[in-house]
Amino acid sequence: MWAAGRWGPTFPSSYAGFSADCRPRSRPSSDSCSVPMTGARGQGLEVVRSPSPPLPLSCSNSTRSLLSPLGHQSFQFDEDDGDGEDEEDVDDEEDVDEDAHDSEAKVASLRGMELQGCASTQVESENNQEEQKQVRLPESRLTPWEVWFIGKEKEERDRLQLKALEELNQQLEKRKEMEEREKRKIIAEEKHKEWVQKKNEQKRKEREQKINKEMEEKAAKELEKEYLQEKAKEKYQEWLKKKNAEECERKKKEKEKEKQQQAEIQEKKEIAEKKFQEWLENAKHKPRPAAKSYGYANGKLTGFYSGNSYPEPAFYNPIPWKPIHMPPPKEAKDLSGRKSKRPVISQPHKSSSLVIHKARSNLCLGTLCRIQR
């Protein structure tokens, strides 16, 4: 007997790549299993026909008849008791195998239709024909344990099929999300490239505008500089012309002034020369002064005439000069009083006066004589 659980024979290593939906069957002729296949345009299930491995030698005809309906998804029990108990087991096994094969083909086609979202008319016609060929097993030939076992296996099969469908749907959703993510990524990259290109174009335009603006400002500054230089040259020429005119006028005035001064000097010279000639003429006829000079000749005082001596003054002040009395300052008086505390002895003061006596001789003019009175 086989081990309890999945109730399936052990597969060789070549059948390990198939999905859980692939089940061994009693007949090695034509079995099918649904394998997820991804194409260029969509995803879905593709029905792959694969020969079932041969059952072990220990399996009898009754065991094959017991295990053959396990892959039948749409298997239903007959409530009416059949009368064909006397038929041979070989015919029953062949009928059950054909029904299981037809039901599996229908399940695979239905799953492919659900996943791909499209069904062909040919598959529908085949399914209708297969549904008509289904043969319900009489319940009288199965024991209660077999009925329970088959129901459990059908539930397990349905659960596994639903799980496979859910996993496949999840894979499809994940793949769709990945495709959408890749699409969004490509769109984002394209938008980023467009944005970068736009920014570069904008920067280039701004740079060109800046360069053009700088060149325009530079040209305007150069034009303004040239205009200012020309204006400055004109102003300088006007100023230079004005200065030259002023310099010429100043030199002209200086020449006129110098000429006038020379004329005045010449006139003064002429007048002075004229006056000198007149004085010289008059001096010849003017009487000489008396000999008022004195000198010693042969040891005797004698008078003689000298033209170098000063003439006798015509007037002199007969009142002798007296110095003005200036009282000493108070501070000096106080300081002198503090320094000398000795009693001052009064001495008789001899009044003297200086009298300027001008001798009548020319030898000692302005002689000071001290006369004591």
From Swiss-Prot:
It comes from the Eukaryota. Residues 61-76 have a biased composition (Polar residues). Keywords: Cell projection, Chromosomal rearrangement, Cilium, Coiled coil, Flagellum, Phosphoprotein. Expressed in sperm. Its main location: other. It is found in: Cell projection, Cilium, Flagellum. Residues 328-337 have a biased composition (Basic and acidic residues). Signal peptide: none annotated. One of its GO terms (biological process) is spermatogenesis. Residues 77-101 have a biased composition (Acidic residues). Residues 1-112, 118-137, 324-352 are annotated as: Disordered. InterPro entries: CCDC34, CCDC34/181. The modification Phosphoserine is found at residue 52. GO terms for cellular component: sperm midpiece. Involved in spermatogenesis. Has a probable role in anterograde intraflagellar transport which is essential for the formation of sperm flagella. It is linked to Spermatogenic failure 76: An autosomal recessive male infertility disorder characterized by oligoasthenoteratozoospermia, and abnormally shaped spermatozoa in the semen of affected individuals. Sperm flagella have multiple morphological abnormalities, including short, absent, and irregular caliber flagella. A chromosomal aberration involving CCDC34 is found in a patient with hamartoma of the retinal pigment epithelium and retina. Translocation t(11;18) (p13;p11.2). This is Coiled-coil domain-containing protein 34. It comes from Homo sapiens (Human). The gene is CCDC34.
